[in-house]
Amino acid sequence: MDRISITLGERSYAIIIANGLLQDPTSFWPLARGDKVLVVTSNYIASLYLEILSQILTELGIIIDLCILPDGEQYKSLAMIDKIFTALLKKYHNNDTTIIAFGGGVIGDLAGFAAANYLRGVRIIQIPTTLLSQVDSSVGGKTAVNHPLGKNMIGTIYQPTSVIIDPNCLATLPRRELSSGLAEVIKYGILFDVNFFNWLELNIDALLGLEPHTVTWCIRRCCEIKAKIVTADEHEKGVRTLLNLGHTYGHAIETHMGYGNWLHGEAVAVGIMIVVQVSCSLGYFSNVDTERVKTLLLRAGLPVIGPMKISLEDYLPYIMRDKKTTNGILHIILPLKLGSAEVHTYRISEWQKLIAHLI
């Protein structure tokens, strides 16, 4: 069992990683006999794993209520938050309750947002079931819902009590979702760890084949990187900003194409290629490494070119609303070389010229 700590004073918590954790009663600290929980999950995950989770919680003497939501990014909305609140209120959950987020990134965001706001904050345990949520979104406390005009526009940072990662859950993950998660994995190598990027080049086929040791090691390495970043910069005022690599255009694609039509990792992969190519054209990122990034993304089953139906002008409203834009100045994350990146600032008009040939 791997245990990674995020040290944030009284909000510190552990990420626990091991195959079979879902059936290990010692995983569910700090729950105790007689505690009350609301399990928030999706139809798909409920059909596969809810019986297993319910059985272990029942054996621990935990009182379980359920809130089962539809699957898909299009449901990451305030309407679903209201459903969670209603489930909590109807069953008389008070401020010592615990919400369990049992699912992928959408469920983690919804449950986390609800936990942050219900009775001004209740405990939440994250049990991520997709690669993307295991390596990224379940760690660090970011929670948000979408708005028709932009992704993740309504949210907060609210740390979980613990994160329980069972890589066995990936056995039922659709291949497209697995590839989507690999975009965030590759992002870590580009940003912070050239040796990890090199390792990914050697092991991408084993990851796609869900080779157990390889997958578990990969998840652990990603969580180690994310934990270090979050511990240093919880509220994204410094180094944590770098984790937004590729997300400005990624979020624009997801929103413009309709939530759920492009998966998050697919859109981020395109966003990564845009900034890598810009960095190369500016003389930072080498041609050789640009091709390495492109090749690895393609091998992971990810797109490297955005949808043809989005024009340069179509992107503009999303860029103007992006959290990294202030007073017409876009703060963009540019990789300088494999394992290193920094934030550069451009007027939106200047940036549009830089990427015109890439859209």
From Swiss-Prot:
CDD domains: DHQS. Gene3D superfamilies: 3.40.50.1970, Dehydroquinate synthase-like - alpha domain. GO terms for cellular component: cytoplasm. It is found in: Cytoplasm. Disulfide bonds: none annotated. Binds 1 divalent metal cation per subunit. Can use either Co(2+) or Zn(2+). Pathway: Metabolic intermediate biosynthesis; chorismate biosynthesis; chorismate from D-erythrose 4-phosphate and phosphoenolpyruvate: step 2/7. It comes from Baumannia cicadellinicola subsp. Homalodisca coagulata. NAD(+) binds at residues 71-76, 105-109, 129-130, 142, 151, 169-172. Zn(2+) binds at residues 184, 247, 264. The lineage of its organism: Bacteria, Pseudomonadati, Pseudomonadota, Gammaproteobacteria, Candidatus Palibaumannia. HAMAP family: DHQ_synthase (MF_00110). This is 3-dehydroquinate synthase.
